From Swiss-Prot:
Residues 1-23, 80-115 are annotated as: Disordered. Belongs to the COX19 family. A motif (Cx9C motif 1) lies at residues 30-40. The gene is COX19. A motif (Cx9C motif 2) lies at residues 51-61. It holds the Pfam family CHCH. InterPro entries: CHCH, COX19, Cys_alpha_HP_mot_SF. It is found in: Cytoplasm; Mitochondrion intermembrane space. This is Cytochrome c oxidase assembly protein COX19. Transmembrane segments: none annotated.
Length: 115
């Protein structure tokens, strides 16, 4: 019996995924990152563009814990995602070049020069 396919057909040979297989996170090492990502997806009506930072953090956790092979984030489509907490605050940024002509601020006349 052929059970739905011709008996002369070649045997099906599965092919492995292009990036290999990823072990499951049985110990929950990256569960917090996964929950953050899923929460973001729910809050943003499954718009993954708004949750790319969470996706990057989750993949970094998996790579750090050995749950997937280390790869460059650009290869994973997340090379342009920047963590805003890693940036210096805007108030502490200073200019490196001094002002050549500082703006003139008029001063009120002193009482000594009044007539």
């Amino acid at each position: 019996m052929s059970f739905g396919r011709p008996g002369f057909a070649d045997v099906f040979k599965p092919s492995p995924p292009a990036r290999g297989s990823f072990p499951l996170d049985h110990d929950g090492e990256c569960k917090a990152f996964m929950i953050s990502y899923l929460k973001c997806m729910k809050e943003n009506a499954n718009d993954n563009g708004k949750c790319r930072l969470f996706s990057k953090q989750y993949l970094e956790c998996r790579m750090d814990k050995g749950l997937m092979a280390r790869d460059d984030m650009a290869n994973l489509g997340l090379g342009d995602v920047v963590d805003p907490s890693a940036l210096p605050p805007a108030s502490t940024q200073t200019t490196t070049a001094p002002l050549s002509n500082p703006p003139h601020v008029p001063q009120p006349p002193s009482s000594e020069h009044r007539i």
